[in-house]
């Protein structure tokens, strides 16, 4: 009884409760695929231009292509059509429901609610679960709010928040008993609905999440926001999300994400994007996370065939990294719709898995085939992946570029990483810690920096990469390096490590001399580039460039050197010069190990590998005689025994 009372209290005050989460969103559950759904005939106007038969037909088509989860949107002004009346000189008089009397205190249109229940019934009949985006006030670059609130900032205006809370409570109360609903989403990218400080955004999220939990404490509250930052002062930040919400979401579109759309869509940088960002959000917050919106942004960015190929690699990556669900944006093309935002912007019109007349695109086929492939495996869920290193990020900066750069370098080096906030309550145990692309003059607090270095004293290895004018105190003490001169001057040099040569670009020159450190490699100017220093019982490996933020993926030998210094040895390792292979290792309770190998190259590849163990079986590829063969943008699962 005490536990029930406590959970009720936590739910009532709007703070995220710890505990079990729906398997679609957490590591260890069966992987779900799906999409974001607007009806094929009307898009966002599906509720006002209702066609029940078309909705049934749409959902049948989606279910036939293996989709078991949809994100759906009650368009806010259609469901809560409140209006305002004004008197002399524009003085506000009162609110009305669609210009008439209120039919319920929340001003909710019951005809729209009936249509939403029909959607729920149709989904349940087909085994589809729904993530419901409650405050759908922003969609595809257009604001959609009730007429009475059109000139307000709906994130900060007290009247707007009052009506939002009323709407959410009414909607959740009326639909919470439907079995098709898996989770409540705050809404679609609600941080795009108005300007707000981090504190104001906290208040808004608190109000909406509290309203949800007052009516339904049994389902998780999902973020749905557009980008979450490590930077504590950002509107939507990791600490705020962790405190208030149950499940994190990513919208990993390369076109809109820094350092992503700088390579072809069907290559490694973009193939890793969804898994990398989703793992980052989960690790930063300690909450489950899933890819809620993914997509190519249409045939103007990537052909339909290449989009499908990249999706296939992303699906394998997300599944291998313990991400519970992957949803594409969106179900159907919207190229025949003549209202805004489709009247405004061409890039939003051709994003569907299906054409507007219902023809399946290669992406729909790839989604179906991946889900079918998982069904052929002798296990329903994949054991958690092995993690070798912790990348330590800071709340003093927006760390996305560093996080992504570290992920790509680690993938190419053949190791697996997780993330942690330097200012967090705990620092996970690991043989290797990475302080990537240390920036500015005060990225890590004194306490955070020494907490990492204390791990080196105790026997771990710490990799520090530093460039672009950054200053770290105690550099000489912790790395065995002395700074002779450090000044702003464009600098391009070459480095060779273990026979692999690559270039680095920096905005500054940092001239170093070894003062206890061992120089493992110098750059082409003769300056120490890669060094190692014995520190306590452990080691500090240092590289004199910010390789993570500058998208210098060819510098992966730096990460391999640090992994070797930490004594990390994987069961399957790539041995060749080509590094477009991702490997994750998963130990089962019966002693077997499964290795998921993802080929991020847009062509079939035969990789040279070292295998420590006996290959008992391979699915969707071949692994024999030191060669691993995988199709273009595809994945292979290997079962090993030792």
Question: What is each PLM-predicted segment?
Answer:
Residues 4-12:
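Sec-dependent N-terminal signal peptides
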Residues 25-245:
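Active-site mouth of glycoside hydrolases
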Residues 54-58, 166-172, 228-239, 271-281, ...:
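Alpha-helical scaffolding within the catalytic cores
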Residues 199, 214, 218-225, 229-299, ...:
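Glycoside hydrolase catalytic-domain groove-lining segments
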Residues 294, 307-345:
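Substrate-binding cleft of secreted/luminal carbohydrate-active enzymes
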Residues 331-388, 405:
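Aromatic-rich peripheral "rim/lid" segments of glycoside hydrolase catalytic domains that contact
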Residues 365-432, 589, 632:
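Aromatic-Pro/Gly-enriched surface loop or interdomain linker
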Residues 440-642:
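A conserved amphipathic helix/loop scaffold
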């Amino acid at each position: 009884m005490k536990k029930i009372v406590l959970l009720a209290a936590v739910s009532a005050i709007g703070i995220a409760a710890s505990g079990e989460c729906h398997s679609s969103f957490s590591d260890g559950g069966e992987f779900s695929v799906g999409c974001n759904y607007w009806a094929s005939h009307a898009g966002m106007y599906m509720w006002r231009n209702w066609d029940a038969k078309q909705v049934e037909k749409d959902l049948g088509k989606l279910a036939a292509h293996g989709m078991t989860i949809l994100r759906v949107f009650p368009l806010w002004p259609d469901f809560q059509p409140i209006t305002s009346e004004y008197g002399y000189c524009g003085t506000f008089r009162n609110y009305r429901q669609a210009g008439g009397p209120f039919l319920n205190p929340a001003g909710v249109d019951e005809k729209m609610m009936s249509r939403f229940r029909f959607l729920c019934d149709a989904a349940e009949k087909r085994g589809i679960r729904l993530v419901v985006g409650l405050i759908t006030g922003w969609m595809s670059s257009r604001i959609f709010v009730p007429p009475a609130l059109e000139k307000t900032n709906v994130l900060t205006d007290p009247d707007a928040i009052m009506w939002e809370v009323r709407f959410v409570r009414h909607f959740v109360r009326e639909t919470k008993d439907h079995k098709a609903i898996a989770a409540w989403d705050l809404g679609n990218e609600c941080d795009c609905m108005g300007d707000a400080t981090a504190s104001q955004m906290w208040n808004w999220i608190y109000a909406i999440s509290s309203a949800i939990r007052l009516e339904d404490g049994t389902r998780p509250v999902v973020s749905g926001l557009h980008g979450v930052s490590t930077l504590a002062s950002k509107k939507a930040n990791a600490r705020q999300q962790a405190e208030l919400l149950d499940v994190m979401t990513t919208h990993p579109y390369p076109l809109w994400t820094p350092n992503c759309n700088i390579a072809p869509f069907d290559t490694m940088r973009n193939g890793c994007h969804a898994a990398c960002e989703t793992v980052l959000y989960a690790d930063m917050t300690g909450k489950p996370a899933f890819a809620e919106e993914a997509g190519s942004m249409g045939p103007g960015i990537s052909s339909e065939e290449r989009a499908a190929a990249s999706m296939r690699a992303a699906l394998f990556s997300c599944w291998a990294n313990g991400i519970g669900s992957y949803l594409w944006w969106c179900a159907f093309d919207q190229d025949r719709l003549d209202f805004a935002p489709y009247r405004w912007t061409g890039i939003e019109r051709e994003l569907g898995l299906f054409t507007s007349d219902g023809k399946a695109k290669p992406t729909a086929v790839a989604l179906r085939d991946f889900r079918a492939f998982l069904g052929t495996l002798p296990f329903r869920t994949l054991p958690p992946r092995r993690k070798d290193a912790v990348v330590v990020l800071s709340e003093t900066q927006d760390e996305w570029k560093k996080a992504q750069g570290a992920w790509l370098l680690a993938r190419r080096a053949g190791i697996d990483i997780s993330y942690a906030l330097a200012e967090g309550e705990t620092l996970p145990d690991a043989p290797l810690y990475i302080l990537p692309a240390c920036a500015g003059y005060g990225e890590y607090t004194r306490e955070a920096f020494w907490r990492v270095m204390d791990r080196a004293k105790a026997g771990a290895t710490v990799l520090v990469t530093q460039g672009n004018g950054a200053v770290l105190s105690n550099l000489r003490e912790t790395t065995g390096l002395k700074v002779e001169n450090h000044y702003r001057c464009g600098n391009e040099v070459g480095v060779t490590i273990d026979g692999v040569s690559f270039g680095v670009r920096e905005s500054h020159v940092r001239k170093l001399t070894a003062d206890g450190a061992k120089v493992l490699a110098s750059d082409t100017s003769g300056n120490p580039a890669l060094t190692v220093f014995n520190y306590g019982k452990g080691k500090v490996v240092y590289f004199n460039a910010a390789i993570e933020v500058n998208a210098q993926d060819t510098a992966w030998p730096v990460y391999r050197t640090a992994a070797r210094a930490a004594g990390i040895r994987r069961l399957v390792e790539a041995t060749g010069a080509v590094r477009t292979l991702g490997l994750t290792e998963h130990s089962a309770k019966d002693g077997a190990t499964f290795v998921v190998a993802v080929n991020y190259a847009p062509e079939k590849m035969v990789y040279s590998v070292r295998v420590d163990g006996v290959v008992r079986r391979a699915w969707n590829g071949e692994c024999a005689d030191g060669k691993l063969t995988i199709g273009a943008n595809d994945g292979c699962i290997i079962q090993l025994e030792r």
